[in-house]
Amino acid sequence: MPFSTPHTTRPKKITGLRYWMLRVLEECEHVSADFGPDPVHDLRVSLRRCRSLADGLMALDPDPDWKAMKKAGRRLFQRLGALRDVHVMIEWVEKLNPSEASVAQASVEAGDSPALPLSQQIREFIADPTDPKASPNDPAAQALLEILQRREQEQQHEAQTALEEFDRKKWRSWSKSLPARAARIRMGSALFKHLALERWTTAGELHNRAMRNRSQVAFHSLRIGIKRFRYIVENFLPVEHKAWSNDLKEIQDLLGEVHDLDVLWSTAVSCQVFPDEDSRKRWREIILSERTKRIDRYRAKMIGPDSLWQVWRSALPQGKQIQVLATRRMKLWANGLDPDFPHSERVASLALQLYDGLLASGWQPSVDAASARSSLFAAALLHDVGKSAGQKGHHKTSFDLIRAHGNPLGWQPADLQRAAIVARFHRGALPTRKHKTLRDLLPDEQKATIQLAAILRLANALDAAHDGHIRRIQIENVQIGVEKSRKARTNRFQRKPSSVTANEAVVIVAEGYSPTSSTAQTIAAERHLLETVLRRPVVVKPMRNPIEPRASQ
């Protein structure tokens, strides 16, 4: 905030998550002893740092304690928010008071009436007609300060209750366990750059909206968006933070002051503190002038080809690297939930080999082929994340987790939503169009989802033993989807091999497959859905002459 400074004099050496979590406990003690602006501000800063660290790390680490810690910190942070707003508004009233009560602040800073709340100190000074240095009091300022004084006292009681209800024992326990998990991910990693790009993209959209309509809501949302971007840079990208920290802080402060002014005006209007229209107009002009100065400064730094937006964007992932990093993030998240993630990676490879082989044979999914392939890949990688909650019904848990996880930048939301449903049907009951997860989809989308689920079920069966003995597969007879009578020729040679007949089986040869193994029994049971989709039998047999592995995503 624009006026408060930390009340401690010790150097602010930042040493990571554990430092900030212990700092929260320390600042709780300070606030319990003094509900003044600086202790409250410092506690909220410490809570915000812990929450922002959790926000970044929980995008990569699925440990539920991140969410629990963030929730506990948010609850205390929010319950202190009203008191902090009162403090900020008091400071703004003193600064903007048309009767120039700047001497009042000097008196406060000199230590007069230290036992009184800030609002009462300023109010008593402004209202003192015997002070020779005081200028005539502004009625609106006095009325607003009276209201803020009452609110300050009320919110101090709320803050005291919030501190008493804050579970410091649990917080201290998290301060020991969570920093160890955070240390597993290297600061400055490209994964954090990808996360920063996500935040940058969201903030950029909010910037465009704020520049179009300039509403209070738009600028408040922009402030939050830039704050979230700043925290990722500040917490996880030390090189970029060293280069950008001053600009990021200035931009956030400008928008923070715009927000403070908007809150001050809304409070003054709602409390009807203006004695007449002239007073209202005078205050409106003062607040609008201060607000405009800050927005103009923001625009000067954030609009144009050489703006800070472009400087920040140039240092973040570009082009194909974005999807590569998105996939790495998805794998890291899944690896923290899936008890046998190497199995899921093998299933993903086999699923793509089967999918590509079917495409080469002439089969086509009912939706865009590239989009369907992306969905299949994601579903295969993530199909067992539900095992983190137990084996029973884990396919349903996987569905819920994938849908709730969100969409990393570089992946299409529709592809991942489809992947969640495909993962849901990698085992258990066969999918039907009437199932609740499918019935609201368009017919082509229903069909594609069932097609991909059929491929995933067979790919999963191919590694049913979880030992990787089936390494790669190939469809032996091709041209599934081409009519037999179609014989396009070039120089008397067929352009493609002849298609199989309507009832001929699709033969899949698999390196490492044994027809006498337990895996063969699982394959025989799980191939039914693919046979239904392709409308022909599916046969799996050993590969006689192993081929080079087909490139996969």
Regions found by a protein language model. Give the residues of each.
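A short interface-forming secondary-structure element
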Residues: 504-523
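Divalent metal-dependent catalytic cores for phosphoryl transfer on phosphate-bearing substrates
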Residues: 343, 355-475
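Short hinge/gating elements
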Residues: 229, 328-338, 435-446, 511-515
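Short edge beta-strands and adjacent turn/loop segments
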Residues: 469-482, 495-496, 500-505
